[in-house]
Amino acid sequence: MRVLPATLLVGAATAAAPPFQQILGLPKKSADTLAKPLHDLQEQLKTLSGEARHLWDEVASHFPNNMDHNPVFSLPKKHTRRPDSHWDHIVRGADVQSVWVAGASGEKEREIDGKLEAYDLRVKKTDPSALGIDPGVKQYTGYLDDNENDKHLFYWFFESRNDPKNDPVVLWLNGGPGCSSLTGLFLELGPSSINEKIKPIYNDFAWNSNASVIFLDQPVNVGYSYSGAAVSDTVAAGKDVYALLTLFFKQFPEYAKQDFHIAGESYAGHYIPVFASEILSHKKRNINLKSVLIGNGLTDGLTQYDYYRPMACGEGGYPAVLDESSCQSMDNALPRCKSMIESCYNTESSWICVPASIYCNNALLGPYQRTGQNVYDIRGKCEDSSNLCYKGMGYVSEYLNKREVREAVGAEVDGYESCNFDINRNFLFHGDWMKPYHRLVPGLLEQIPVLIYAGDADFICNWLGNKAWTEALEWPGQKEYAPLPLKDLVIEENEHKGKKIGQIKSHGNFTFMRLYGAGHMVPMDQPEASLEFFNRWLGGEWF
């Protein structure tokens, strides 16, 4: 069987994945490790229905030049685990689970829900002066360990610059799937960026200006995280996030009492509905979840894929990138694409969802990608294809690969990479890409506010598609929300008071924002506007 690389939604950006690695080039032991899953994949294909086999055959016939290699599976990252004596604190999940309290009826019950026995949290107070990143701000780094499954997730916590005793706590997630949230830290919204001299530069518009922020490298084998196993779908990753937050707030109860929010972008449009639902499913928890924020996310493919042609062909507020012939070819491909996504939604079967992802990405994203235009920002060309179009991403990777940086934060892997393409392919071949995670959003809206924001120059997760899926979503407030017009969003304070930074519509717990002049990474392109809406959202202005 031959398969095709999918388009990659990195947390901060999106690009075509590089060619697959030839498994014959791997060490013999690694090749043997891959043999069984590839054999199982071939065997499963033999059992498919005629319709499902036809979908796979059709994808191969439409894109013969790209269907060159079998999928690969992620290999363990080289690492050296630090001794327990290195860490200031180790929080044992088993200890948390052993705490019983009297319930409302007098019966004993666990103080905190969830299966946490296999998890530990390692914590180290990081010296800010060692790296020069936000000196004076309290920082913690460490790992969440799933000892049962050999998974180790890296996190980096920055306390609020303002009033950490009262300011909210935010978890930030980049996407991919398979891209490090440290990209968001140093390229977008963290306390420092990295310049061309590979030195940290203070960020005046950091999101920890009025909130404490946790940056989490997930799933495993992303960034500084590592494992001997692999995670290949969003649901599995959600269990780890719940464990991390539970143990972190157990160690630091002073933060647990604050409001907590989850924010992320791109493939976090998949992650966040699942992660938030996982948290809310535990009635006895120490996580004070108040809202979620999704920026330029992929959440409802069936609706969003309608809007690649309009965005590429001049209907999104920017000049057309494609000629009429290419626009027509995208129109011609759309009905088949939507039919395949509908089949994926109806079955949620990997054998249906995988070909839908491959066909639709190539038919509707391919024409744009072939122009060389930046898929994250319709206003310009891709400046550095080796770093997903952004030179700054290369600076971040070079910085995080420095030995002194890895030592300062307690990283245990031998090297850092911004995106792990094996993880991306694992999620793709598990069918995760097209699955209907938007169906979880109505359940969230019953309990917490949801913000969908989008930079209006992004192509890959464009504002047209994000606005459309929020309007198409079936929830009790749909009839009131959907027809609402967009209104001006302006800066309320400082010397730029009254400046228009975007548009907004909001009803009940649901809010959509269009941010002017920003691509896929809103905080990078429009830092002032980004911090403006972020602070006002956390302040509860729209809910």
Curated annotation (Swiss-Prot):
Disulfide bonds join C179-C419, C313-C327, C337-C360, C344-C353, C382-C389. The keyword Protease applies. Glycans are attached at N210, N509. The active site is at S266, D458, H520. Residues 18-124 form a propeptide. It is found in: Vacuole. One of its GO terms (molecular function) is serine-type carboxypeptidase activity. Keywords: Carboxypeptidase, Disulfide bond, Glycoprotein, Hydrolase, Protease, Signal, Vacuole, Zymogen. It catalyses: Release of a C-terminal amino acid with broad specificity. Gene3D superfamilies: 1.10.287.410, alpha/beta hydrolase. One of its GO terms (cellular component) is fungal-type vacuole. Pfam families: Carbpep_Y_N, Peptidase_S10. Its EC number is 3.4.16.5. Vacuolar carboxypeptidase involved in degradation of small peptides. Digests preferentially peptides containing an aliphatic or hydrophobic residue in P1' position, as well as methionine, leucine or phenylalanine in P1 position of ester substrate. Belongs to the peptidase S10 family. This is Carboxypeptidase Y homolog A. The gene is cpyA.
